[in-house]
Regions:
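Short, Lys/Arg-enriched N-terminal segments with co-localized hydrophobic residues
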Residues: 1-5
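Active-site-adjacent pocket-lining segments in enzyme domains
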Residues: 8-11, 16-17, 31-40, 58-188
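Short N-terminal binding/cap micro-motifs at the start of the first secondary-structure element
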Residues: 17-22, 46
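Short glycine/proline-centered loop/turn elements that form peptide/ligand docking sites
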Residues: 23, 40-43
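Rossmann-fold NAD(P)-dependent oxidoreductase module
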Residues: 28
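Short acidic-hydrophobic surface loop/beta-edge motif
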Residues: 45-49, 144-147
Length: 188
């Protein structure tokens, strides 16, 4: 039987983040007892999402101690994705995590941030159809969720539930992912 200790994840939010993706990730990870920090990459804890939903982050990205964090996650959205890419703490943390074997995940347009950092070179990945051409160096797959080593990508809001369940599986185990899937009545 798999044994999982309390995992920690940071989900980066920025001005213009796709709120459905971002909040779904936070909600399902927290249901799985993953300790999630919502970290603002916009210099303020108060964020306005891509569809004008007001969100309060737990901390600024620059204030988070990443030393015991197991995974960082980048939701998509425009202009959220370029705003994440413009934040040095976000990009430096993604590079550090990817190179040290820690988990990095991105959905929708956000895998383009990982590609711009060279983190998808020689890896399988996916992104929103409008951003697949930005995945330089990657073998692009047009599927909901792609896991290649320590990097997980998804193609967008339509794949957000399977993406979130995959992150739950990675951080809390298959049994917990199955429990969450049943609890939310996701039958796909």
């Amino acid at each position: 039987k798999e044994v999982f200790i309390m995992s920690k994840a940071v989900v980066f939010f920025a001005e213009g983040t796709e709120e459905c993706e971002a909040l779904l990730l936070v909600g399902l990870l927290r249901r799985a007892k993953v300790e999630v920090t919502v970290a603002s990459a916009s210099g303020s804890r108060e964020i306005v999402s891509s569809h004008k939903v007001h969100i309060t982050a737990d901390a600024l990205a620059e204030e988070v101690d990443y030393s015991d964090v197991d995974m960082v996650v980048l939701p998509g959205g425009i202009p959220g994705t370029p705003n994440l890419a413009a934040n040095k703490t976000v990009t430096d943390t993604c590079v550090s995590f990817a190179k040290s074997g820690k988990k990095v995940a991105a959905i929708c347009a956000a895998p383009s941030v990982l590609a711009s950092l060279g983190l998808l070179e020689g890896r399988k990945a996916t992104a929103h159809a409008g951003f697949q051409d930005k995945l330089a160096g990657a073998e692009v797959l047009d599927t909901e969720v792609v896991v290649d080593g320590n990097i997980t990508t998804s193609y967008g809001l339509g794949g957000a539930i399977p993406f979130a369940l995959e992150l739950v599986r990675q951080l809390a185990g298959q049994a917990e992912a199955d429990r969450i899937q049943n609890a939310i009545a996701y039958r796909h």
